Each structure stands twice: as C-alpha cells, then as structure tokens.
C-alpha cells in the first residue's frame, strides 16, 4: 500500500459511525521533515515548525510556552503522551500528531469532528505503523 493510500484510506476517511465526519487535513511526514504523503488540504509548513515538533517529542514540554505552529497556524498545546503524542487546540478545532519509529502521523480537525475522534484516527494508524516497525 502506498503512503498516499494510508492518508486517503485511513486518515481522510469517514469516522466510524459518523458519515461525512472526517479530518480537515492529514499527512505522514518523516522525522527529517520530508513529506511521505499528505491530503491536498495539509498546510505548507516551514522546516523550523517541524524542528520544533521533533524537539517536543524528544524534550516534552518544549512547545508549551510558545504553542505548536504548523503552516503559520498556532495551536495551544494540550495534554499528550510524552514522546509519543502531541495534541493541540485552536478554537473549535485542533491537531493530533503521533510519533512512530520513522514518521509523524498528523491529523487536523474542525467541528463537528471531536478531539477524541481525531485522536482515535491518528493514533490507530500510528500504532499500526509502529507494529509494522515503521
């Protein structure tokens, strides 16, 4: 399966039990900042934004004072899982980022999708990739 298929079929799909509820944008990005696959709606990000995200995975709490920035959008960092998941909130939407051995799985959402639904979609794919050694 191509990386684009993972984004299209496992991240940008209808959320279980909620037809027409899907993430706003999603991507799989290598730890080096190279995009493996992304939805057409995923924001163009700056290298320093990706560096900040990677630093927060290695040094949990790094982004808390400044917020998480992606594509020029600032998210307030909320509870995550140190070294494994970063979650951010902005208005009625937010972001979930799951770290795997080689990649970061991104999901961005707006209402009516809930934070829990975004977490489920992103973390399920991230956990699967971890199980596959990726």
Curated annotation (Swiss-Prot):
Function, as annotated: Binds to actin and affects the structure of the cytoskeleton. At high concentrations, profilin prevents the polymerization of actin, whereas it enhances it at low concentrations.
Query: Which protein, by its recorded name, is this?
Result: Profilin-4
Phosphothreonine occurs at: 114
* Primary localization class, coarse: cytoplasm
Entry PTM: Phosphorylated by MAP kinases.
Quote the Pfam families the UniProt record gives.
Profilin
Is the keyword Zinc in the record? no
Share what the entry says about its subunit structure, partners included.
Occurs in many kinds of cells as a complex with monomeric actin in a 1:1 ratio.
The record's misc note reads: The variability of the residues taking part of IgE-binding epitopes might be responsible of the difference in cross-reactivity among olive pollen cultivars, and between distantly related pollen species, leading to a variable range of allergy reactions among atopic patients.
Q: What are this entry's molecular-function GO terms?
A: actin monomer binding
Q: What is the lineage of its organism?
A: Eukaryota, Viridiplantae, Streptophyta, Embryophyta, Tracheophyta
Q: Which SMART domains match?
A: PROF
Print the keywords alphabetically. Answer: Actin-binding, Allergen, Cytoplasm, Cytoskeleton, Disulfide bond, Phosphoprotein
| Record-linked SUPFAM superfamilies | Profilin (actin-binding protein)
Q: Where is this motif: Involved in PIP2 interaction?
A: 84-100
The record, for InterPro entries, names: PFN (IPR048278), PFN_euk (IPR005455), PFN_sf (IPR036140), Profilin_CS (IPR027310)
Question: What Gene Ontology cellular component terms go with this record?
Answer: cell cortex; cytoskeleton
